[in-house]
Amino acid sequence: MATKLLTPRRPNSQQLRVLPLGRDTVSFWSDMDKAVAVRPSTFHAAPKHDSHGPCILLTLSLLLYVGSAWPQSQLATIVGTITDPTGAVIAGVQITASSKSTGLKRAALTDIGGHYRLGGFPPGVYAVRAEKQNFQTQVIEGIALSSGTAIPINLSLSVGTVQQDVTVNADVAIDTTTSTVSGAIVERSLIDLPLNGRDLFKTAILQPGVTPTPSSAPSLLSNGKAGQASINGMRPSWTNVLIDGMDANDPVFGFSPAGASGFFLGLNGLTEVRILTQTFDADYGSYGGGVIEAVTKSGSNQFHGSLWELHRDGSLDAKNYFDLASRPIPAFVRNQFGASIAGPLAHHRTFFFANYEGFREVQASTAIATVPDALAHQGLLPSAVDPGACNNTTPSGCVAVAVDPRLAQFLALLPPTNGADNGDGTGDLVTANKGSTTENLGLVRVDYNFSNSHSLFARYMIDDSSSLVPYIGTPPGTYVPGFPALRRARNHYFAVQDRRNLRQEVFNEFGFGINRTTASTSIVDTHPGLSISLLPGRPFGMLNIAGMSLVGNSPVIPLGSSSTVYQVQDQLSSTTHRHTIKLGVQVRRIQSNGPLDFGVNGLYTFQDLRPFGFQARTNNPALEFFLQALPVSYVGVDPFNSDSNRDYRQIVVSGFAQDFFRATSRLSVNVGLRYDFYSNPSEAHGRLSVIRNPATDSGPTVGKLFAETPQICCHPRLALLGTSSVTARPYCGAEPASFAINSLLSCLVSIGF
């Protein structure tokens, strides 16, 4: 049976409060016993002053999300110069790079300056062979290539007429063709590193300038996603995550991909993780933080497999500082396990890789809530004159408050205190309820080599998870037990990429991807039949009593969204004697569907009513007025206007041009230009209205979010790179800082809240 509390009455009827909600503006009057919906709420946007207005608004947005980043090529390049023992360059040297594991080969001839460039190599270990008539053949083995890097391999060939191979092992080389500051973590380290939760983001913090965010509970507003990293002090949502060159960030909230566990699983399915922290080339953009690139494993000519499990529990744990001494250590058991298999489907041509990871966890979380003590449950509170006279030994020194009979079922939601007494009718309630998390991740990748100059791969990854959360402590949540929530998340990531050498000096990469992320947080109704909502059949809402912990289910639950991002991108690179030119374009279509509910289950607020003319006799007026069922406000949803579902749409187009120019043997110039275009966010069914200027508008304007979107979003790049010798050791580098526009769609959702 629904229970409804009366608003406080005073002799002169007046409006107490007007609350703008996510869908309704609700007024509360002192002589009414119900909420009245005045008119539908609207999204607000800054008034139009110039074409840069939306940019300024986005910078100030609470839930700022930085839009799409065009990824640098996931393939590596080998460059170098061939000389003779006197230092003279040698033209016409046959350079061949090959991989034993996949059979991939690339070949080129040095130009008149002795330079060569071989591109299109997936991350891995390669060998380079240099040969020319009348010179000894030289072979360099063990060259480890990382994604998006250009590794210099400079050789000096000795004169010799006898056929002879000189084989040496490669030293660690530095990419001198870019000013980007980055670090790579290779496959062996990904497996061996003792990472908590086997989380991808734990690898990022190994790099300078990267710090983890506090390990708190996943935020409601991030749909349960957590595990973020801050790069160079920027917001975690400004960190872009790429999987095989495809953007994997949530298009609405900007958070990086993760399941309900808060971890980004799947490290055993990755061959490399690369973290870029600053001074990016033009093929990166639109993100104010850094970039984390993950490259999935591929198969080889040999069959390989793995089977593993990690177990962790609380057997050797010490008690938390807040745990009660009389209680056992809160339960904690975590199991992570997985298996993988890889091999050839057709020797030297088709390879596959499959990976599975599972995550199971049961953990009790210690929580401290402020609730009424045993005397307050009986209507006995300390007096404002002599509060120390009220205690369990002398209850006669307490002030008796007439408890409204309708509050009995609400007081039953509040267990008695078992911790410190606050001396105002409240005390601490320390509990440790159990939560559980289940997550499963699967990855399948197939690579097909048409020839040494043409290859294709397809990859699909799914992450399905759910988590029972005993406390939604993140505001507006509660640490009072008995109001758990259920988080669910299912993420799909699909990508196809075609790579081909059009000519020896021209390489093209075409990619297509679809990301679909569905996340929700719902109420576990543990008190059926108890409701304060204006809508029938809703679970219990929330009581907000000043000076106490919130009681009930969070007013922002249920919360969820389903987002789909379509990505099409193409990048062309061409090499001449002195220039390496890259051109690229990317088109992204963003679809985000879901409700933005607030207060759908009802929210009563109790506080000191003495400013409104009421009298209080105790030292805790808010609790006193609660016991008398006198709220200051109620937030609810108009039963006749309760549809908050919205289907948002946006298109983002990005393009760039980058030229690496070798000016001299010791100086190179890296110059680039990037352009980003963001369409005006829209709602598929026209259910979007905006108050463009609150000072002059008489009502909302139905239509798109902004009157005008930014049109000039150009971002130049310039870097100087020098070498102390032909061995290509960098001695200087400079690049002007640039900052890019943020996604307009996330601003729409932010304002909507």
Give the role of each language-model region:
Residues 164, 172-228, 235-282, 286-293, ...:
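Acidic, glycine-rich flexible loop segments
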Residues 26, 43-45, 51-183, 268, ...:
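Periplasm-facing N-terminal accessory domains of Gram-negative outer-membrane beta-barrel systems
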Residues 227, 269, 288-290, 335-339, ...:
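Hydrophobic, lipid-facing positions within transmembrane beta-strands of outer-membrane proteins
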